[in-house]
A protein has these predicted regions:
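Ribonuclease/tRNase effector modules and their secretory precursors
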Residues: 1-106
Length: 106
């Protein structure tokens, strides 16, 4: 568990271990992506269920690494991290397009 900017982040120890093994990134390291003021958040309809709505966030960490992070909200201020990895080329393009829309640039 980690608290950051009035949010609490939780995760499964097993999922975190798998994420470190598969993506070389812990959830504790990935959580600050939520501080990115331009974080793109999309509904992850393919993996959502009636019991759990999942979201995909694309944002920059403090070290300029662009991440894709899957999460759900357990309560208003509790975010459960499910997966985190470096963004794909397409996700990076989506993020840049969002920045361009915000600032009106090409």
């Amino acid at each position: 568990m980690l608290s950051l900017e009035n949010k609490t982040f939780t995760w499964s120890k097993d999922k975190n271990r798998d994420n470190i093994k598969n993506h070389r990134l812990s959830f504790r390291e990935a959580a600050p992506v939520f501080l990115d003021p331009y974080l793109v958040v999309l509904h992850d309809q393919a993996h959502s269920t009636m019991e759990e709505t999942r979201w995909k966030g694309i944002g920059v960490l403090h070290n300029d690494l662009l991440l894709s992070i899957i999460f759900s909200e357990e309560k208003e201020d509790v975010i459960r991290l499910i997966s985190a990895r470096e963004a794909t080329k397409k996700e990076k393009e989506d993020y840049r397009e969002n920045i361009n829309r915000i600032f009106g640039t090409q």
